[in-house]
UniProtKB/Swiss-Prot annotation:
Sites where the protein binds GTP: 17-24, 81-85, 135-138
Disulfide topology: none
GO biological process: ribosome disassembly
Name of the encoding gene: fusA
The protein's name: Elongation factor G
One Pfam family this sequence matches: EF-G_D2
Length: 697
């Protein structure tokens, strides 16, 4: 079966923004106008097509990024709707990794908000070209020009308006198209499906002329032919302007700005035009780089072509109630037929693809073959996880894995009955496969199952899904901070595990050096044993013993990280040595070495941004200081203050209720993980004695 859509007629885009900026509503309107959905879904009514999990429909937020395909002007657009809540940052990171372009949605009243900055930084990391859509132009206080200023100030980039609004707030009627120099007014009675092209209103003519000059100047800076025409005052055609905007956008030199109100059905078609005209096709972005499976130093290149070997990256795993596990992936090169076999690089095994599905939010269409540039879902891949590369087994390649942040918050869950215990095990396994920022472990002291994640909302939704989708009855504890441990100085120690009680004994003896590593590095193991003092087959078990001991912590049972361990000497016994003996010796050695290396407790510090009316600023800042917070700065926006601070997570539980009562419901805040820092001695002592008190009882 041959390809039906040429690569240059494809767009893989994401819609990303701050929570409540209107991403899902925007996507719903796109589906309506491209003819994919016959009734518009509303987020606040809980009927949005893209928000298909019960938890999403209840809360009116998007948790999973649903992938959808639609068409506009004969161009196939694959859209991924991403969550804007900071607890679901991993979803955004994952979807940006596989996209070629994005529409960044901003609220016309608030402009750039904290999560907008996070999403923007993630898009910068993956060099994703973006269009800025200033949404909610019909809201009271909507200000297009202020929003553009916040993009300059807070995102430190170059937004270039290619449209201007006609009116604002309830008088927002349409837009001025600066390329065609015409006005567009939407008709309310047709749900915005039809619009009238008008002359630019008199009061906007001068402004439109001025902004068109700015636009042409911005694009001609990156195009010599245009620059020459611009300086000479020669006429520049609309097609040349469009080509110039496209070139500068794909090169990340400018970010075109458009506006509208998705909820009131204004500006969506012109946004689709901008997606088609200015965002890249898979051919416009650099070829994907990967690593050689056998030689990680060697870089391999895969071009977006059906003739290259097949390679794809799995960016999402979901459990569908009807077809079972779905693996969403982006094809970078080659093609694959339904029922074919693929090589899973991470698991080093071949797997058969049962069916290939093209998703339309929660409806699915079966397809026979997929090609370079496609985004689709597969059924039947048994051992697949998020971030895995699947490829042609004759030409293996490792596409860049996706880095996910460490969880910062945890809670204990206990199944109510024996039957619940089995169900819970299965539910947790499936949920962890879908979401790599959700981790699970069993507390060795209490035997409780501990779930850890990116925030209170993240864990609340996981527990909710566990109970609803998998029918698990469970008692849930209060959220707690995920502390960590590390060391502050070098030390040495030896571990000797010797048991000789007649017959087959046990003998393992190791000597190690430990040293602290920079924050965020993790664990490093170096084998420096020479002269066969420890046989090769015992090196791995020694490392395993060390790793497991560090996972269990030294001070207070929290995982220890940022440690380098060098195994430099030891001894063995021909008969009595075993893998288990060396594993135990490794564990003994690291416990002793870590105790001597000044172990300390680390806590997650959150970047907290509080938005309050000016009158409450003093009180709120005083309260943040009381929570061991550091104020990083404040800025004035209208008559509200934005307070930026770094506060320990342990001091932030219940802050949502507290800030509301402190500001009579007028204050709000957002927070995301900043970094791990050492806990002050007094607090550390309290935490350690609390943990040790529990274990001695």
């Amino acid at each position: 079966m041959a390809r039906t859509t040429p690569l240059e007629r494809m767009r893989n885009i994401g819609i990303a923004a701050h929570i409540d900026a209107g991403k899902t509503t925007t996507t719903e309107r796109i589906l309506f106008y491209t003819g994919k959905s016959h009734k518009i879904g509303e987020v606040h009514e809980g009927t949005a097509v893209m928000d298909w999990m019960e938890q999403e429909q209840e809360r009116g937020i998007t948790i999973t990024s649903a992938a959808t395909t639609c068409e506009w002007r004969d161009i196939q657009i694959n859209i991924i709707d991403t969550p804007g809540h900071v607890d679901f940052t991993a979803e955004v990171e994952r979807s940006l990794r596989v996209l070629d372009g994005a529409v960044a949605v901003f609220d016309a009243v608030a402009g750039v908000q904290p999560q907008s900055e996070t999403v923007w930084r993630q898009a910068d990391k993956y060099s994703v070209p973006r269009i800025c859509f200033i949404n909610k132009m019909d809201r009271v206080g909507a200000d297009f020009y202020h929003s553009v200023d916040t993009i300059v100030d807070r995102l430190k980039c170059r937004p270039v308006p290619i449209q201007l609004p006609i009116g604002a707030e309830e008088k927002f009627l349409g837009i001025v198209d600066l390329v065609e120099m015409r006005g567009i007014i939407w008709r309310d009675e047709t749900m915005g499906a039809k619009y009238d092209v008008i002359e630019i209103p008199d009061d906007l003519k001068d402004k439109a002329k001025e902004y068109r000059e700015h636009m042409i100047e911005a694009i001609s800076e990156h195009d010599e032919a245009l620059m020459h025409k611009f300086i000479e005052g020669q006429p520049i055609s609309n097609d040349e302007i469009r080509a110039g905007i496209r070139k500068a956008t794909i090169a990340l030199q400018i970010f075109p700005v458009i506006c509208g109100t998705a909820f009131k059905n204004k500006g969506v078609q012109t946004m689709l035009d901008a997606v088609v005209d200015y965002l890249p096709s898979p051919l416009d972005v650099p070829a994907i780089e990967g690593l050689d499976v056998d030689d990680p130093e060697k870089t391999l290149i895969r071009h977006a072509s059906d003739n290259e070997p097949f390679s794809a990256l799995v960016f999402k795993i979901m459990t569908d109630p009807y077809v079972g596990q779905l693996a969403f992936f982006r094809v970078y090169s080659g093609s694959m037929k339904s029922g074919g076999s693929v090589f899973n690089v991470a698991k080093r095994r071949n797997e058969r693809v049962g069916r290939l599905l093209r998703m339309h939010a929660n409806k699915r269409e079966e397809i026979q073959e997929i090609f370079a540039g496609d985004i689709c879902a597969a059924v039947g891949l048994k051992t697949i996880s998020t971030g895995d590369t699947i490829c042609d087994d004759a030409h293996p390649i490792v596409l860049e894995a996706i880095d996910f942040p460490m969880p910062v918050i945890q809670l204990a869950v206990e199944p109510k009955t024996k039957a619940d215990q089995e169900k819970m095990g299965m539910a947790i396994q499936k949920l962890a496969q879908e979401d790599p920022t959700f981790r699970v472990y069993t507390d060795p002291e209490t035997g409780q199952t501990i779930l850890s994640g990116m925030g209170e909302l993240h864990l609340e939704i996981i527990v909710d899904r566990m109970m609803r989708e998998f029918g698990v009855g469970a008692n849930v504890g209060k959220p707690q901070v995920a502390y960590r441990e590390t060391i502050r100085k070098n030390s040495e120690a030896e571990g000797r595990h010797v048991k000789q009680t007649g017959g087959h004994g046990q003998y393992g003896h190791v000597k190690i050096r430990v040293e602290p590593l920079p924050s965020g590095t993790g664990f490093e193991f170096v084998n420096d044993v020479t002269g066969g003092r420890i046989p090769k087959e015992y090196i791995n078990p020694t490392e395993m013993g060390i790793k497991e001991a560090l996972e269990g912590g030294i001070l207070a049972g929290y995982p220890m990280s940022d440690v380098k361990v060098t195994l430099y000497d030891g001894s063995y016994h021909d008969v009595d040595s075993s893998e288990m003996a060396f594993k135990i010796a490794g564990s003994m050695a690291i416990k002793e070495a870590a105790k001597r290396a000044k172990p300390v407790l680390l806590e997650p510090i959150m970047a907290v941004e509080v938005v309050v009316p000016e009158d409450y600023m003093g009180d709120v800042i005083g309260d943040l200081y009381g929570r061991r917070g550091r104020i990083e700065g404040t800025e004035l926006r209208g008559n509200t203050r934005i307070i930026k601070s770094m506060v320990p997570l342990s001091a932030m539980f219940g802050y949502a209720t507290d800030i509301r009562s402190r500001t009579q419901g007028r204050g709000s805040f957002t927070m995301h993980f900043g970094k791990y820092e050492e806990v002050p001695a007094a607090q550390a002592e309290e935490i350690v004695s609390k943990v040790q008190g529990k274990t001695t009882r």
